[in-house]
């Protein structure tokens, strides 16, 4: 199948959802050589990935994931694509703790750094979370603490082999888009930041095709986040309906911030910023977290709109609830000496 798919792509033809799924299955099963896998990824990138192709690939990623069981009906993910190259601190990871502190169950999917110096796994490890905790521990964290970290590299074993091909290619491929679409717990409520604005409507369409209950796909001022520095492009998906619009910080009741305020560093530096935000320090990092946590609360049904979400997120921080969720997650994932 993969040879047929490569030929189609080189002719500029789109694959159907089923065809894309067949190719991904072949790659996952080891039926494709590294050369074939690389040619497929490059040809697909050159043609441009469609909603159907991404949905078909995501179907297989979801099926092959090591499933994490969650008993709650509503739980969220704040995993973005990464790769925006802006080197901010870990905004969506911090927002996950704020959402948890506001009473929302969080199954946070994430990985090591893509283009930044600190991915979600890196900063969580620096904060004291055992990101390599086994699946049973992760499930217990989600149930008892209300937040758990789903480490992508551990929970998508079928696609370990493709990692070398991706590294050797050295360019973005469909896999840069698939991570946030393949939460191993099956989250149907999520905030998904993308590294380029052109992917906002595309991934909105993909989430609708995959049956998302309520989700926001966002890109703001070059960030795979809701921006407090300017305009954010949004695609909101709710029970099959898709709505596109833009928002500005003022719409959320937040001041406009300078991008330099959101700059991050390595995992240790970012961990300090996360800690300062959760301790209630005012400034650009807090406002960025409030904006993104607000969207998480809305998609979980815990806030009526983004302004209400900002107010509830602020209470989560200022009451100490968000900081307590981090403390509890560290304790729950730490093996006693």
Curated annotation (Swiss-Prot):
Q: Per UniProt, where does anthranilate 2 bind?
A: 166
Q: Where does Mg(2+) 2 bind?
A: 224-225
EC number per UniProt: 2.4.2.18
State the InterPro entries in the record.
Anthranilate_Pribosyl_Tfrase, Glycosyl_Trfase_fam3, Glycosyl_Trfase_fam3_N_dom, Glycosyl_Trfase_fam3_N_dom_sf, Nuc_phospho_transferase
Enzyme group, top EC level?
Answer: transferase
Catalysed reaction(s) here are: N-(5-phospho-beta-D-ribosyl)anthranilate + diphosphate = 5-phospho-alpha-D-ribose 1-diphosphate + anthranilate
**One Gene Ontology MF term:** anthranilate phosphoribosyltransferase activity
Keyword list, A-Z: Amino-acid biosynthesis, Aromatic amino acid biosynthesis, Glycosyltransferase, Magnesium, Metal-binding, Transferase, Tryptophan biosynthesis
Residues where Mg(2+) 1 binds = 92, 225
- For the ligand (5-phospho-alpha-D-ribose 1-diphosphate), the binding residues are 80, 83-84, 88, 90-93, 108-116, 120
What's a GO biological-process term for it?
Answer: L-tryptophan biosynthetic process
As to how many cofactors bind and how, the note says: Binds 2 magnesium ions per monomer.
Q: What pathway, per the record?
A: Amino-acid biosynthesis; L-tryptophan biosynthesis; L-tryptophan from chorismate: step 2/5
Q: Which cofactor does it need?
A: Mg(2+)
Binding residue positions for anthranilate 1 = 80, 111
GO CC annotations on file: cytosol
Tell me the protein family, please.
Answer: Belongs to the anthranilate phosphoribosyltransferase family.
- Subunit structure, briefly? Homodimer.
Q: Quote the function comment for this protein.
A: Catalyzes the transfer of the phosphoribosyl group of 5-phosphorylribose-1-pyrophosphate (PRPP) to anthranilate to yield N-(5'-phosphoribosyl)-anthranilate (PRA).
| Name this protein carries in UniProt | Anthranilate phosphoribosyltransferase
Q: Which organism is it from?
A: Anaeromyxobacter dehalogenans (strain 2CP-C)
